[in-house]
A protein has these predicted regions:
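Phosphate-group recognition and catalysis centered on beta-loop-alpha active-site segments
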Residues: 1-253
């Protein structure tokens, strides 16, 4: 089950980032903790499989250079500066060690298959090992992914860690290369019981999706992403029990 903090403390989207504070950086996560918010972050593998906290597959947008995150060693990631600041790409273990249970941390495993298929490599198991150690200490942690195979991998390796599905309409234009039938099944959340999920984080503009409502009626915690204004928050909270946000400051739980 999700720790209660996941339902009471709004989750910063990639930390509390802004001017001079890059997303998914230690500075963004420290700011979130200081303001009483929770944290949502993204995980990609380093060349040796170490879970790194980084959203994109390529380095261009945040590091200003060519290359892919999965080609970096942890040391190279730690020497890669983000958006011209002194902030570098952190490891998941370092972030969780810094937070130390002071805020709920929702870890999103990025797809490694390319089509939300089973080729996730060792990343789910590596994430599970790190997160399970925190969970065993009573720290509020959970893991989710758009890829149900990633969620299932964490569940198999760490059965006590809460897992969820990141979800949306899975529109064709946003999810090219995934067959229509599979996209439809994903939008209907058909994998939810199979993978042993205990929550979802759904796109805020699709909270009226009937499968979302059915899960909510069953008492399944519905979170949502990504809220960018008080008006969007007010609309989302008609269904969602908590939000992932950026660009404004909601009331901290």
């Amino acid at each position: 089950m999700l720790h209660p903090d996941f339902l009471t403390r709004p989750l910063t989207h990639r930390g509390l980032h802004g001017l001079g504070v890059p997303e998914n950086s230690m500075a963004a996560f420290r700011a979130a903790v200081a303001q009483g918010y929770g944290i949502e972050l993204d995980v990609q593998p380093a060349a040796d499989g170490t879970p790194l906290v980084f959203h994109d597959y390529g380095l261009g947008r945040l590091a200003g250079r060519d290359g892919v995150i999965s080609a970096l060693s942890p040391a190279e990631a730690g020497a890669t500066r983000l958006l011209g600041t002194n902030e570098a790409i952190p490891t998941l273990e370092a972030v969780l060690g810094m937070v130390a249970g002071r805020a709920p941390v929702l870890v999103e495993i990025k797809d490694q298959d390319g089509s939300l298929g089973p080729r996730m490599g060792a990343l789910p198991g590596r994430v599970a090992e790190i997160v399970a150690a925190c969970h065993a200490q009573g720290e509020p942690v959970a893991v989710m992914s758009f890829n149900p195979h990633a969620a299932a991998g964490v569940r198999a390796a760490a059965p006590d860690v809460p897992i969820g599905l990141t979800s949306c309409r899975f529109d064709r234009d946003d999810w090219t290369g995934i067959p229509e039938a599979r996209r439809a099944a994903l939008s209907r959340l058909e994998d939810f019981p199979r993978v042993g999920a205990s929550f979802i984080s759904h796109h805020h503009q699709d909270l009226g999706n009937p499968p979302v409502g059915r899960l909510a009626a069953q008492g399944v915690p519905v979170l949502c992403w990504t809220i960018r204004s008080p008006a969007e928050e007010a609309a989302a909270r008609g269904v969602a029990r908590n939000i992932t946000f950026e660009g404004y400051r909601p009331q901290a739980g």
